[in-house]
Structure formats: structure tokens, C-alpha cells
Swiss-Prot record:
Complexes and interactors: Homodimer.
Subcellular location: Cytoplasm
Further remarks about this protein from its record: The thiolation reaction likely consists of two steps: a first activation step by ATP to form an adenylated intermediate of the target base of tRNA, and a second nucleophilic substitution step of the sulfur (S) atom supplied by the hydrosulfide attached to the Fe-S cluster.
Gene label: ttcA
EC numbers: 2.8.1.-
Name recorded for this polypeptide: tRNA-cytidine(32) 2-sulfurtransferase
Length: 302
């Protein structure tokens, strides 16, 4: 092995260790996986869900808690969908899996006018089917492959177009109250997952088989973030850190903070502010390393 090959192998191992560490941190911080859990890992055939399954399988061997997992793919009968790819890949890994066949494609095409975005209806149908599958399989958690950039994109979409400060939480209770959904890749950057997918040579299935128009709002947000990341290295890390450092007393939601009940007091007030001072931020703050929670105990994997 020559010097260039050794360097490439070193970088690949370094990336793999970093992704495993970040997933372990997310699992620990949000108590995503508990002893005896049965995870339903949703596998779409995209880079993120492949990486999620790969990393969870690796961590499963060394985790301090015992858990089972089963990979689930929803075949929505989109024309041209390569039905053999996922079964062949999963069987090569020896992973338990379930392919759920539901022709939601025809339903969506019948309901949504030609040329319109089908993603919203498609996702609602998919969610209902996957919830039902989780119950059938006895899954205690549903694992999705959303990463840090997805979380930030959703935050800006909701703020710019929905008028709400809401992101995509690493762990949530489903709308029907019967399922816990986890996102173990919450601390992982998309560009790292792209590199990882290339190194692992995952058999990627295109995501545009349905022929739907791209979500233009999300594409605009993605382009904005990509430009920021290029022009201001570290800005995305700072923004993600902000989602973990919320101060309701310094926002304007009276349902989260009792503004009406504020009273003067003689002693210093921890949530007080210097009302007449302008906020000053150091330029170096945008170059700070990623933040993944303070004073947390990280799951250790060998």
C-alpha cells in the first residue's frame, strides 16, 4: 500500500470513528436506545438511511445495552423502482428486514395535479403505513436517517414560511402518541454522510423515481446553507448549537415564559439582560467546533 492509499485509508477510518462517536453521543444525550429495545430502521435506499443502518449495526456489537433491529423499506410501487437492490443488500449483511408493498404512487398521482409537488401527501401516507408496520413488528422505536443539515433546513423552513420556531427533534412522540421516533444521525453533517456512502459503496436508489417536482422552498434553504458553509466556515455548527441553547426569556412567546409575572427584585436575576447594551460577538465564534451538549456522558464503543 503506497503513501496515498495509506492516507486515504486513514481518513476513511477517521470518518467512520467520528460518525460512530457522534451517533453514540446523540443516543446518550437523548436516551434514544434502551436495554431491550427493538428498533425499526426505516431504509429508503438513500445515503442517509444506509449510513444509519451501517452505524447502528456496528454500535450494536459493542453497545452497553442490548437491542435488536429490523430494517424496513416501503415499496410504494414507483415505476422503475429496483425491487431487487435492498433485499440483495440486506441479505448480504444477514440483517432481518421487511419489505412493505403499498401502491401509494397511484394514489398520489390520482389526487395531486400533474406537475405539483407530491411530497406532502406521499409522506403522510408513508407515515401511516410505517406506524402500522412498527406495531405489527413490535418495534419499540422507529429510527429515521435525518441528519444535522435536515434539522437546520426544517428550522429555517418553519421560521421563513410557517412563522414558528420549530425544527426536527432528535427524538419525538408520534402524533398518534403510540410511537417514539429517533434520529440517531442528528449530530452528523450531510457532507460527511455523502463521503461515507461513497467509501462504503452503498447501492444508492435514486429518490426522484416518482417524478415529483422538487420542494423549491427546501432547495432554496439548502442553497442558502451551502453558501453560508462555504463563505463562513463554522456557521452551521454555531446555528445547530443555538438549537441546543434556547432562552425562552429572551424570545417573545408568552406561553413559554411568564412575562406578565415579572417583578423587580433586590438580588441579581440570572435571566436578566443588559437592555441598553448592544450584543457583541467575536468573529472567531463562527469557527468554533461543533457542540453536542455540555457535561454529557458519551456512550463508549470500542
Amino acid at each position: 500500500m503506497n503513501k496515498q492509499s495509506r492516507k486515504a485509508q486513514y481518513n476513511a477510518n477517521k470518518l467512520q470513528k467520528r460518525l460512530r462517536r457522534l451517533v453514540g453521543q446523540a443516543i446518550e444525550t437523548f436516551n434514544m436506545i434502551e436495554d431491550g429495545d427493538r428498533l425499526m430502521v426505516c431504509l429508503s435506499g438513500g445515503k442517509d438511511s444506509y449510513a444509519l443502518l451501517d452505524i447502528l449495526l456496528s454500535l450494536q456489537k459493542h453497545a452497553p445495552v442490548k437491542f435488536d433491529l429490523i430494517a424496513v423499506n416501503l415499496d410504494q410501487k414507483q415505476p422503475g423502482f429496483p425491487e431487487h437492490v435492498l433485499p440483495h443488500y440486506l441479505e448480504s449483511l444477514g440483517v432481518s428486514y421487511r419489505i412493505v408493498e403499498q401502491d401509494t404512487y397511484s394514489v398520489v398521482k390520482r389526487v395531486i395535479p400533474e406537475g405539483k409537488t407530491t411530497c406532502s401527501l406521499c409522506s403522510r401516507l408513508r407515515r401511516g403505513i410505517l406506524y402500522g408496520t412498527a406495531e405489527e413488528l413490535g418495534a419499540t422505536k422507529i429510527a429515521l436517517g435525518h441528519h444535522r443539515d435536515d434539522i437546520l433546513e426544517t428550522f429555517f423552513l418553519n421560521m421563513f414560511h410557517g412563522g414558528t420556531l420549530k425544527g426536527m427533534p432528535p427524538k419525538l412522540l408520534s402524533d398518534n402518541g403510540r410511537h417514539i421516533v429517533i434520529r440517531p444521525l442528528a449530530y452528523c453533517r450531510e457532507k460527511d454522510l455523502e463521503t461515507y456512502a461513497h467509501l462504503k459503496a452503498f447501492p444508492i436508489i435514486p429518490c426522484n423515481l416518482c417524478g415529483s417536482q422538487a420542494n423549491l422552498q427546501r432547495q432554496a434553504i439548502k442553497a442558502m446553507m451551502k453558501a453560508w458553509d462555504k463563505q463562513f466556515p463554522g456557521r452551521l455548527e454555531t446555528m445547530f448549537r443555538a438549537l441546543q441553547n434556547v432562552k425562552p426569556s429572551h424570545l417573545a412567546d408568552s406561553t413559554l415564559y411568564n412575562f406578565q409575572g415579572l417583578q423587580k427584585q433586590e438580588s441579581p436575576f440570572p435571566e436578566g439582560d443588559k437592555a441598553f447594551d448592544e450584543e457583541v460577538f467575536l468573529e472567531s465564534q463562527e469557527k468554533s467546533p461543533p457542540f453536542h451538549g455540555s457535561k454529557i456522558r458519551v456512550l463508549q464503543f470500542k
